Every structure is written in structure tokens, then in C-alpha cells.
């Protein structure tokens, strides 16, 4: 039983003969960050955050800052600050509603891409991960971490 793929994914994989490749990629997915992941994530000046609202509608937001603004705060946990961008609070509202998130970290120079799927929560901007000027912090517990080729 696949944790990453559902019936619709499998149907397309079978139609195009990519199930073995998909299985190989799934076998590389993990639930904890390794040292390379940590270095890549913590050096990233931006990432893309996908969230879903209570009606099932997705949205994607750019999140940027100085390298190190995203921290690997546990074996399977990320933390990043939230600042008031445009006042819409789409990401925060969606996290509060459904908690399901996807993150895509990209280096155009390397090239390297890393996907993180997980469950997020909004927490106060205090404690060990305090970020000056941030309104809140978002903590994500990763359920899947995998290279995006």
C-alpha cells in the first residue's frame, strides 16, 4: 500500500509505464530531515507554501527572508516566521482551518528541489525560535520529505 500515491496517481503511472520509477522515488521519501536537508533548508532565501482552505481550495504563497529564516527545529519539524504581507492572511487562515501544507524549496543554481508535506500549526512568536518583528511562527511536522526531480 502506497503512502504517497492514491488510485488516480497509480492509474496515470500505469498508463505511462512509470510505476517502477514512482515506487523508487517513494522509497526515497522519509519522515525525518537529514544533515543535507537541514543545510539546504536553512540556507534557502525563499520557499513556496501550499495550503488548503476549509472548502478544499488550494493556494500557494511565496515565503522569503534572509537565509536561516526557516529552521529545522526537530527531527521532523520546521519553524518559520510569519510577517504581515498583504493583510489577507490566506496561509494562516488555511493552516488554522485544515493544517495540511506542502512546501517546495528550490535552488536554481544547484539545481536542487526538496518537497516537504506535513501538518502545520500557528504558534506565538516566543520561545527558542523567536524571530524579531514576526507576528507568529508556523511549526510544521513533516509526514513526507522527498527530493523533487
Model-derived segments and their meaning:
Residues 1-149:
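Binding-site signature for planar aromatic cofactors or substrates
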